[in-house]
């Protein structure tokens, strides 16, 4: 086409102008090639970003498709889910086993059992009874008779130990509240609690580094314990005895405050004096109370009385036991510590002992809750308040005192008075001149 145009132009135009036309054609051709090359270059450069975007889009879709449809990735997610669920279940089981159903603290050492025997502490001693050479041959028959008596009582009272629902003790709570309220009124009017505690502190032998102790605060509270969820069960010791298990809850503030002085007597007497003020409050108690009636002549109970504890200043090894040369011969039963290594020395109760009779036995389960608040103030000018170490020591000491006396397998025994009607216990309401009824105090 270009050649035709050139020939035509050569025919029409004169020869003088032919050279310039050929140059013009070459220039046009060169410009056309340059434009074509520029268009190709611009087309290549403009298509690269779009291609990269398309490639990224395709790669992302391929990645998502691979995660959705590849079986190996799906099975890994399932494995992780199963392992996670199993680990959660394992942690829950470990927590329940070691924190919820954890065993109670081990029993206290033998030496701490006989530190304070002002209150009678008794403990079941079945090993002594089973291993004693002087055992009564009629024990089996007595046990059978006791079980038959218990079965007859349950049958005649229409009480099923296994299926009977727990009972509320609202009426008992009212009676206990009235009794406690009366005791509080008498204590406030006569100050007998203050005088009794003060006399006890004055008569107590104190170490040389401690000055006399003065009472600064006594709070007997204003709330009452709540008893609930009572159920009758057979005793776990196999004796067949019936016992009542009652839930107890007390939220009150019982406070005792004292003040004293720590004396530094070295190198000379009264070198330094450090005032100390302490206030201990019990703010919460809850637990399961076990109550049963026992016969104090039953040989399965071993009594730990006051004469089994050492005298002040006397070592523990010199404590007297029943039947020993230094013991009290007026007792007719064996005196044995709960952790005694010898289980063969046991003395039978005397059947003619006037102290034998019915007693109320009570104890608390080891899963009790006891909370204290201890406040301390040490020093005269520069005072230290609420020292954590002092609070911890006092709280641990109070808990140990309570465990040694009332936590199973130890329990307390309270002798019940005779319920037989007696003339000296007879009373009658009489009317005075004003028409008011008053209680006759004469026998």
UniProtKB/Swiss-Prot annotation:
GO terms for biological process: mitochondrial genome maintenance; mitochondrion-endoplasmic reticulum membrane tethering; phospholipid transport; protein insertion into mitochondrial outer membrane. It comes from the Eukaryota. GO terms for molecular function: lipid binding. Residues 1-80 are lumenal. Pfam families: MMM1. Residues 126-146, 304-358 are annotated as: Disordered. It is found in: Endoplasmic reticulum membrane. InterPro entries: Mmm1 (IPR027537), MMM1_dom (IPR019411), SMP_LBD (IPR031468). Residues 102-443 are cytoplasmic. Residues 165-417 form the SMP-LTD domain. It is a single-pass type I membrane protein. Its main location: endoplasmic reticulum. The keyword Membrane applies. The keyword Ribosomal protein does not apply. Keywords: Endoplasmic reticulum, Lipid transport, Lipid-binding, Membrane, Transmembrane, Transmembrane helix, Transport. Homodimer. Component of the ER-mitochondria encounter structure (ERMES) or MDM complex, composed of MMM1, MDM10, MDM12 and MDM34. A MMM1 homodimer associates with one molecule of MDM12 on each side in a pairwise head-to-tail manner, and the SMP-LTD domains of MMM1 and MDM12 generate a continuous hydrophobic tunnel for phospholipid trafficking. The SMP-LTD domain is a barrel-like domain that can bind various types of glycerophospholipids in its interior and mediate their transfer between two adjacent bilayers. Component of the ERMES/MDM complex, which serves as a molecular tether to connect the endoplasmic reticulum (ER) and mitochondria. Components of this complex are involved in the control of mitochondrial shape and protein biogenesis, and function in nonvesicular lipid trafficking between the ER and mitochondria. The MDM12-MMM1 subcomplex functions in the major beta-barrel assembly pathway that is responsible for biogenesis of all outer membrane beta-barrel proteins, and acts in a late step after the SAM complex. Belongs to the MMM1 family. This is Maintenance of mitochondrial morphology protein 1. It comes from Scheffersomyces stipitis (strain ATCC 58785 / CBS 6054 / NBRC 10063 / NRRL Y-11545).
């Amino acid at each position: 086409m270009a050649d035709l145009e050139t020939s035509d132009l050569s025919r029409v135009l004169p020869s003088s102008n032919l050279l310039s036309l050929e140059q013009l054609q070459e220039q046009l051709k060169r410009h056309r090639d340059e434009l074509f090359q520029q268009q190709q270059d611009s087309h290549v450069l403009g298509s690269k970003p779009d291609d990269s975007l398309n490639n990224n889009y395709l790669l992302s879709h391929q990645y998502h498709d691979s995660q959705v449809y590849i079986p190996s990735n799906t099975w890994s997610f399932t494995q992780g889910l199963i392992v996670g669920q199993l680990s959660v279940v394992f942690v829950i089981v470990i927590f329940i086993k070691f924190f919820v159903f954890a065993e109670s603290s081990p029993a206290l050492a033998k030496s701490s059992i006989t530190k304070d025997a002002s209150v009678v502490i008794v403990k079941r001693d079945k090993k002594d009874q089973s291993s004693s050479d002087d055992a009564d041959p009629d024990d089996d028959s007595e046990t059978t008779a006791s079980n038959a008596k218990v079965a007859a009582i349950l049958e005649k009272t229409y009480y099923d130990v296994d299926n009977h629902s727990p009972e509320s003790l609202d009426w008992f709570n009212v009676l206990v509240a009235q009794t406690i309220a009366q005791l509080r009124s008498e204590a406030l009017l006569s100050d007998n609690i203050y005088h009794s505690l003060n006399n006890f502190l004055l008569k107590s032998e104190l170490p040389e580094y401690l000055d006399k102790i003065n009472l600064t605060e006594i709070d007997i509270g204003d709330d009452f314990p709540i008893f609930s969820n009572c159920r009758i069960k057979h005793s776990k010791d196999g004796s067949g005895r019936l016992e009542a298990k009652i839930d107890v809850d007390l939220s009150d503030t019982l406070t005792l405050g004292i003040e004293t002085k720590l004396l530094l007597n070295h190198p000379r007497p009264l070198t330094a004096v450090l005032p100390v003020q302490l206030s201990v409050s019990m703010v919460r108690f809850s637990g399961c109370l076990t109550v049963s009636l026992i016969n104090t002549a039953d040989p399965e109970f071993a009594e730990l009385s006051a004469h089994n504890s050492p005298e002040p200043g006397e070592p523990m090894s010199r404590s007297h036991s029943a039947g020993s040369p230094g013991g009290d011969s007026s007792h007719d039963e064996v005196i044995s510590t709960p952790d005694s290594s010898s289980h063969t020395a046991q003395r039978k109760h005397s059947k003619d002992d006037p102290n034998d009779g019915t007693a109320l036995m009570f104890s608390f389960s080891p899963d009790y809750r006891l909370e204290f608040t201890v406040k301390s103030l040490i020093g005269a000018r520069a005072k230290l308040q609420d020292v954590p170490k002092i609070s911890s020591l006092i709280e641990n000491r109070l808990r140990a005192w309570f465990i040694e006396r009332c936590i199973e397998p130890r329990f307390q025994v309270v002798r019940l008075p005779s319920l037989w009607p007696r003339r000296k216990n007879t009373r009658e309401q009489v009317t005075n001149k004003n028409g008011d009824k008053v209680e006759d105090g004469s026998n």
